[in-house]
Amino acid sequence: MRSKFKDEHPFEKRKAEAERIRQKYSDRIPVICEKVEKSDIATIDKKKYLVPADLTVGQFVYVIRKRIKLSPEKAIFIFVDEVLPPTAALMSSIYEEHKDEDGFLYITYSGENTFGDFETA
């Protein structure tokens, strides 16, 4: 999936920003979170997050749910490289495995399981 953030910001600028963030906040992970294009779920109000390294994927999903004001009965799926990461995984390990060459971790979310693959631990 194409990232709007990548389209709007040149690579060198993104890389420099991610490096600056990692130097200043070594215990945080720079995350870009965007909605899957054709999903009918609400669009998030901000794309950029500084996530504590010890946060789990499940806790990050909770943050996203709150930001888009998603009711408890509605489903949300988050994807890293078009795969559902394990809920108990630490964001730091997801970052190390899937960070982009610009230094950001790109996460997409949807109201439906659009890709269908689960990552096995």
Curated annotation (Swiss-Prot):
Propeptide, residue positions: 117-121
The gene name on file is: apg-6
Q: Give the bilayer topology.
A: Lipid-anchor
Q: Does the record bear Transport in its keywords? A: yes
Q: Where is this site: Cleavage?
A: G116, D117
Superkingdom of the source? Answer: Eukaryota
Q: State any GO CC term.
A: fungal-type vacuole membrane
A Gene Ontology BP annotation from the UniProt entry: cellular response to nitrogen starvation
- UniProt-annotated location(s): Cytoplasmic vesicle, Autophagosome membrane; Vacuole membrane
User: Sites of Phosphatidylethanolamine amidated glycine lipid linkage?
Assistant: G116
Name-wise, this protein is Autophagy-related protein 8
Sequence similarity: Belongs to the ATG8 family.
- Could you tell me which species this protein originates from? Neurospora crassa (strain ATCC 24698 / 74-OR23-1A / CBS 708.71 / DSM 1257 / FGSC 987)
What kind of modification does the protein receive after translation?
The C-terminal 5 residues are removed to expose Gly-116 at the C-terminus. The C-terminal Gly is then amidated with phosphatidylethanolamine by an activating system similar to that for ubiquitin.
CDD domains documented for this protein = Ubl_ATG8
PANTHER family annotated for this entry?
A: MICROTUBULE-ASSOCIATED PROTEINS 1A/1B LIGHT CHAIN 3-RELATED
Enumerate the GO terms in the molecular function aspect.
phosphatidylethanolamine binding
